[in-house]
Amino acid sequence: ILWATGACLFVRTATYKEVGGLDAGFFAHQEEVDMCWRLRSRGYRLVCVPQSIVYHVGGATLNAESPRKTFLNFRNSLLMLYKNSREADLKHVMRIRFWLDYIAAAKFLMEGHIQNAKAVYEARKAYHQLKPEYAPKRKENLEKSTLSTIPELMRDSLILAFYLKRKRTFKAIKDRR
């Protein structure tokens, strides 16, 4: 697997420290995905134990409809992509992401969620402001990466596969990498 939810994630302390742990700048959204991506790119295996039972109160930090939650999800995922995407992939990924973000903002507007639409724009603005601060982290992540590709990373967008290609299960997506 590429990542595991922070609600049920175990990482050895030495390994956690080695990869820099959770990014404190991500507060409450996507920090575990970012860390797992760094773990995976440095050759660590992430495993799932399907027999596990976990109880988690999702959305306890921020309500699902909260513009702050929308802001953090969009900003943090942009920063995560910037921090971890290979140089060869970054421009392509960000170009697609640009359009997907504005489609999402338009959808929020059409649904009457004006503050969530604004949050998407604000997240993009914050990403561009924070990008120079994250450049050293990106450099370190790419330098310490031991894998040229991560098999679990999808080549195409999961969002496009779901909405445009009508792929409703992960198994239905044939070419993940």
Task: Annotate the PLM regions.
Residues 45-139, 144-151:
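Active-site-adjacent helix/loop segment of glycosyltransferases
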Residues 34-37, 92, 104, 159:
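Low-complexity, compositionally biased segments
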Residues 1, 10, 135-177:
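Glycine-rich phosphate/pyrophosphate-binding loop
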Residues 22, 27, 116, 162-163:
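Aromatic-residue hotspot detector
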Residues 31-33, 100, 155, 174:
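Intrinsic disorder/low-complexity signal
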Residues 2-53:
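A short, conserved alpha-helix in the catalytic core of glycosyltransferases
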